[in-house]
């Protein structure tokens, strides 16, 4: 069961979890409970039929109170453009964005720093979804290990500026961090 927030959203909320953990549904529930919907900033690209189906399912799950913006790379700019005090911004997901950044040959440290700077003073509440990829086996390939390491660094950097951090396992949200900073 996904529990919905009964309180206003903090400036920045990070929702972490494994694959199919319920993290996206929980993040959507937080925004729904606080504002009845918001702006959904999607970082995924439908590169194949399976991913297109995932994107469609996510979109179908959200109600009419949502606006979708697709931005696979320019996340800090999109955050600045779409965050608003009266309309929460949900970014799903950071690890897909990171894979896009790495595939494009961009400097991950610079991109991460730009995102963290944008999150340090958002124009409205922001909820970010990210995969926790460091709990499994050590990846077999150098690229896989580099991705796992960069995802860990990204999650740590975002968690450091977030007022709330939630880990979702088996559909159950566990609050890891909660500070008293709301919009």
Residue ranges and their predicted role:
Residues 2, 9, 13-81:
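Conserved P-loop
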Residues 5-10, 84-85, 113:
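Catalytic phosphate/metal-binding cores of nucleic-acid and nucleotide-processing enzymes, i.e., regions
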Residues 35, 61-63, 84, 121-123, ...:
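Short, well-ordered coil/turn elements that cap or connect secondary structure elements
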Residues 38, 89, 164-167:
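Short, well-ordered beta-strand core segments
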Residues 27, 58, 90, 131, ...:
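Residue-level signal for inorganic ion chemistry
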Residues 61-110:
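Helix-adjacent hinge/juxtasegments
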């Amino acid at each position: 069961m996904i529990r919905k927030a009964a309180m206003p959203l903090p400036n920045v909320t990070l929702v972490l979890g494994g694959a199919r953990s319920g993290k996206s549904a929980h993040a959507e529930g937080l925004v729904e409970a606080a504002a009845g919907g918001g702006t959904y900033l999607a970082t995924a690209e439908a590169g194949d039929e399976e991913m297109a189906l995932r994107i469609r399912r996510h979109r179908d799950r959200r109600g009419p109170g949502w606006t979708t913006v697709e931005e696979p790379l320019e996340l800090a700019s999109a955050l600045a453009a779409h965050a608003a005090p009266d309309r929460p911004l949900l970014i799903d997901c950071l690890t897909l964005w990171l894979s896009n950044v790495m595939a494009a040959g961009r400097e991950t440290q610079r991109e991460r720093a730009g995102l963290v700077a944008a999150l340090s003073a958002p124009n409205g509440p922001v909820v970010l979804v990210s995969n926790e990829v460091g709990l499994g086996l050590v990846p077999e390939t150098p690229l896989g290990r580099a991705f796992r390491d960069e995802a860990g660094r990204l999650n740590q950097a975002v968690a450091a500026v977030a007022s709330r951090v939630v880990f979702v396992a088996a559909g159950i949200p566990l609050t890891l961090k909660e500070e008293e900073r709301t919009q």
